[in-house]
Swiss-Prot record:
GO terms for cellular component: extracellular region. This is FMRFamide-like neuropeptide. It comes from Callinectes sapidus (Blue crab). GO terms for biological process: neuropeptide signaling pathway. Cardioactive peptide. It is found in: Secreted. The lineage of its organism: Eukaryota, Metazoa, Ecdysozoa, Arthropoda, Crustacea. The modification Phenylalanine amide is found at residue 9. Transmembrane segments: none annotated. Keywords: Amidation, Neuropeptide, Secreted. Belongs to the FARP (FMRFamide related peptide) family.
Length: 9
């Protein structure tokens, strides 16, 4: 999984 923070979703 990955954080939405850096993707700005």
């Amino acid at each position: 999984g990955y954080n939405r923070s850096f993707l700005r979703f």
